[in-house]
Amino acid sequence: MKTSESTDRFGGVAGETTNRTVLLLAHTGRPAALRSARLVHESLTRAGVTVRMLASEIEAIRKTGARMQPVEVVEPGADAAAGTELIMVLGGDGTLLRAAELARPAGAPLLGVNLGHVGFLAEAERDDLSDTVRCVVERDYSVEERMTIDVAVYNGGRTSAAPAVRTWALNEATAEKVESGRMLEVVLEIDGRPLSRWGCDGVVCATPTGSTAHAFSGGGPIVWPSVEALLVVPLSAHALFARPLVVAPDAVIALEVLPETTDGVLWCDGRRRVELPAGARVEISRSKTPVRLARLQQAPFTNRLVAKFALPVAGWRGRAAERDSG
């Protein structure tokens, strides 16, 4: 526990609040998130930290009849998090992925408080809210970087000089079929060489962070965040060779939607949609711009898996020292 005069992990003084700004985001569809946002806002303001919020979220809180203390109002966009030291997110993984769109351009770390279901990206739970606010005020947290991927869509396949769309993803980019009664026909390419053709429901291209999301539901492996790799997971592929693949982190993955197939659609983190007409080409590669996550504790990733997925570990004995340390 730090005192008000202790040095924080960023070289400042814990409790020092001069010119400090935190962007606060909440899931406006959850009453609990709106109540928590109001309490967090009041606590940070009392501590001398400027709170910035989106205009739409302030309006959602006011519609509940709650009165708001002074707050810095911004609109969503690339500059929403500019100049902030942290983005505090109240909600589930979907809310955190929305917040990542604001955090990535500014390089601001995300600190998630889970008010959803699994909340795999969140660092704290609802019952930890008061202590989480204290950690923010005292700068009692560390920051880790998570790999993201750049995504380029060429509507003319290899003949396109420039991509029709450029976007990115923290978890995954997923090419999916549009028509329920027809398969999407694609060819997978790794580093400029064709690997396999699949008739499938779709293909997930994921980061290690995304290995516990859509890729996991499709039968892909869980990859520790410290492992540098990219994943390719075919969904319900009608092929003998249709296994999840783990490829080098600097590999260039390409999916070509065959001209004779139905149109598809590309989803990035389940939020950004891009149409994939027949003949389109999707190229996916490691991005130079990571997303930063704030961590309150240095618990092993194994512990997070056990807690979030409620994995059965009863009967484990291990070494005596390991049992004693929990």
From Swiss-Prot:
Cofactor(s) the protein requires to work: a divalent metal cation
Compartment(s): Cytoplasm
Catalysed reactions, semicolon-separated: NAD(+) + ATP = ADP + NADP(+) + H(+)
UniProt superkingdom: Bacteria
Entry-linked Gene3D superfamilies: Probable inorganic polyphosphate/atp-NAD kinase, domain 1, Probable inorganic polyphosphate/atp-NAD kinase, domain 2
GO molecular function, one term: NAD binding
EC number: 2.7.1.23
GO biological process: NAD metabolic process; NADP biosynthetic process
Presence of keyword Transferase: yes
Active site: D93 (proton acceptor)
One of the Pfam families matching this protein, by short name: NAD_kinase
Chain residues that bind NAD(+): D93, G94, R98, N171, E172, R182, D201, T212, A213, H214, A215, F216, S217
One GO cellular component term: cytoplasm
UniProt keyword annotations, A-Z: ATP-binding, Cytoplasm, Kinase, NAD, NADP, Nucleotide-binding, Transferase
NCBIfam families: PRK03372.1
Family: Belongs to the NAD kinase family.
Function: Involved in the regulation of the intracellular balance of NAD and NADP, and is a key enzyme in the biosynthesis of NADP. Catalyzes specifically the phosphorylation on 2'-hydroxyl of the adenosine moiety of NAD to yield NADP.
Protein name: NAD kinase
The organism's taxonomic lineage, starting at the top: Bacteria, Bacillati, Actinomycetota, Actinomycetes, Streptosporangiales
Gene for this chain: nadK
